[in-house]
């Protein structure tokens, strides 16, 4: 090969190698960019909700001939699909209840601006628990707090704070309401807020901060709802509402709601005679509620809700140790599962219970006649055996010398099971404490535990003589 041919050959080879290197660098660049965008491709969820996902740092060291490429993907916030809650995990096995939270609202009102409230409850989103109550449009140390014993005024609003944070002046007023229920479907909060005239009230359905639907009174006699959390399964939320006599036949309906819109209404069916102020919990694939019979029974009604076909059944808790107040003493009280016991049925108080196999856990006032003291216990066979009375694992939450009030259930989903928790309303002021003109409350909260626990009493604790009049 002559010198000219050698030069041409070397030049051609060099040009070919250079071309290959150039094309490879283009391929590397395209691959890197493609991987970058594929790494962060995420489906956009409905209603534009995003949750931060863990950032992933990808380092690529690619060596090609004499070129070194170091590519680092920056940290990014990636939209992650938020799913509806389905509550399909089993119920936690518990030995009793352990202290969880206490807000001390009345004690703090002696020296601070705290709302006057009643009808409190607790509900949780997937990450945090909140306390709710119906405010009276005034703080306690304020002349507007006079005569706040009345349940229904146009100034009452639903208040919402993180659990354990008393309702201070900066508290959010979610809606106008003198009766309410709230629950989180996994994507957003639903609030059911009842207000208006006794004979023509309105229930507003607020979802994700927006008014979505409403319904008017259907019996023109104090439309009212649960005063505790509703329950959502796979995007369908259920709420029990009653309109009609508080001491006679009333018209109870179960509303099915999807993202704030009423999609179905079922009438109450089964053997329950009177149903108010239900304490509901998820019992997959349905919802179960323990309610107040304010007409015939001191045994509590049970309402079973089928979320799939909208069917309803109702009965009564079988335990002969009954849960309402007033009631007969435990020796003479009865319950036979299907019907009201006709024992001191007129009047009552909101309460709760939940099934545990054939047994039942329940809470009630210690007093048989007044809203004083509070206790919890398990009744063996109390869910399935008529008039069962074998009580175990009794705990005192509030001693009998101190006032209690409404109580209700809420559910918390853990890693492997669903825990049941309850709150107790600790009422202070009128009617019993006539030194002051106001009526308000604080709360104490307990949750189920599989561990051991001690004893105590957790009353409101405010000295009424130190309180504003």
Swiss-Prot record:
Pfam families, A to Z: Neur
Major localization class: virion
Binding of substrate, residues: 118, 152, 276-277, 292, 371
Organism field: Influenza A virus (strain A/Udorn/307/1972 H3N2)
Record lineage: Viruses, Riboviria, Orthornavirae, Negarnaviricota, Polyploviricotina
Reaction equation(s) it catalyzes: Hydrolysis of alpha-(2->3)-, alpha-(2->6)-, alpha-(2->8)- glycosidic linkages of terminal sialic acid residues in oligosaccharides, glycoproteins, glycolipids, colominic acid and synthetic substrates
Cofactor(s) this protein cannot do without: Ca(2+)
Function: Catalyzes the removal of terminal sialic acid residues from viral and cellular glycoconjugates. Cleaves off the terminal sialic acids on the glycosylated HA during virus budding to facilitate virus release. Additionally helps virus spread through the circulation by further removing sialic acids from the cell surface. These cleavages prevent self-aggregation and ensure the efficient spread of the progeny virus from cell to cell. Otherwise, infection would be limited to one round of replication.
SUPFAM superfamilies linked: Sialidases
Alphabetized InterPro entries for the sequence: Glyco_hydro_34 (IPR001860), Sialidase_Influenza_A/B (IPR033654), Sialidase_sf (IPR036278)
Protein name: Neuraminidase
UniProt KW keywords: Calcium, Disulfide bond, Glycoprotein, Glycosidase, Host cell membrane, Host membrane, Hydrolase, Membrane, Metal-binding, Signal-anchor, Transmembrane, Transmembrane helix, Virion
Active-site residue list: 151, 406
Annotated segments matching region Involved in apical transport and lipid raft association: 11-33
EC number: 3.2.1.18
Membrane topology according to the record: Single-pass type II membrane protein
Summary of subunit composition and partner proteins: Homotetramer.
Gene that this polypeptide is encoded by: NA
Activity: how regulated: Inhibited by the neuraminidase inhibitors zanamivir (Relenza) and oseltamivir (Tamiflu). These drugs interfere with the release of progeny virus from infected cells and are effective against all influenza strains. Resistance to neuraminidase inhibitors is quite rare.
Region Head of neuraminidase: start-end pairs: 91-469
Localization per record: Virion membrane; Host apical cell membrane
């Amino acid at each position: 090969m002559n010198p000219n041919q050698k030069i041409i050959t070397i030049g051609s080879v060099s040009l070919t190698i250079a071309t290959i290197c150039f094309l490879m660098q283009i391929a590397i660049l395209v691959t890197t960019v493609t991987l970058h965008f594929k790494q962060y491709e995420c489906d956009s969820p409905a209603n534009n909700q995003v949750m931060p996902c863990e950032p992933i740092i990808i380092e690529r060291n690619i060596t090609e001939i004499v070129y070194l490429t170091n590519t680092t993907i920056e940290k990014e916030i990636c939209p992650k699909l938020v799913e509806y809650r389905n509550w399909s995990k089993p119920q936690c096995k518990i030995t009793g209840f352990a202290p969880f939270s206490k807000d001390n609202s009345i004690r703090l009102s002696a020296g601070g601006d705290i709302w006057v409230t009643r009808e409190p409850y607790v509900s949780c989103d997937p990450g945090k628990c909140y306390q709710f109550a119906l405010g009276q449009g005034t703080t306690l140390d304020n002349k507007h707090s006079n005569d706040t014993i009345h349940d229904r005024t146009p100034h009452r609003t639903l208040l919402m704070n993180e659990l354990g944070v008393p309702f201070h002046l900066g508290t959010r007023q979610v809606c106008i309401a003198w009766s309410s229920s709230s629950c989180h479907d996994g994507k957003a909060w639903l609030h059911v807020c009842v207000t208006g005239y006794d004979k023509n009230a309105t229930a507003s359905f607020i979802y994700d901060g927006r008014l979505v639907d409403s319904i008017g009174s259907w019996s023109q006699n104090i439309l009212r709802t649960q005063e505790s959390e509703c329950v959502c399964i796979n995007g369908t939320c259920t709420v029990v509402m009653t309109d009609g006599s508080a001491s006679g036949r009333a018209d109870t309906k179960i509303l099915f709601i999807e993202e704030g819109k009423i999609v179905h209404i079922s009438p109450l069916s089964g053997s329950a005679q009177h149903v108010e102020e239900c304490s509901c919990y998820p019992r997959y694939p349905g919802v179960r509620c323990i309610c107040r019979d304010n007409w015939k029974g001191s045994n509590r009604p049970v309402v079973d809700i089928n979320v799939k076909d909208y069917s309803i059944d109702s009965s009564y808790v079988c335990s002969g140790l009954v849960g309402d107040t007033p009631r007969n003493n435990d020796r003479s009280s009865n319950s036979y599962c299907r019907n009201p016991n006709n024992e001191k049925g007129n009047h009552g108080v909101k309460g709760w219970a939940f099934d545990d196999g054939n047994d039942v856990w329940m809470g009630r006032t210690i007093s048989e006649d007044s809203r004083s003291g509070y206790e919890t216990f398990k009744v063996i066979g109390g869910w399935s055996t008529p008039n069962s009375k074998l009580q175990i694992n009794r705990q005192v939450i509030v001693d009998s010398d101190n006032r209690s009030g409404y109580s209700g259930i809420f559910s918390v989903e853990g890693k492997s099971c669903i825990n049941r928790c309850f709150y107790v309303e600790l009422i202070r002021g009128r009617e019993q404490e006539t030194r002051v003109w106001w009526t308000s409350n604080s709360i104490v909260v307990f949750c189920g535990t599989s561990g051991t626990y001690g004893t105590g009493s957790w009353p409101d604790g405010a000295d009424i003589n130190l309180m504003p009049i």
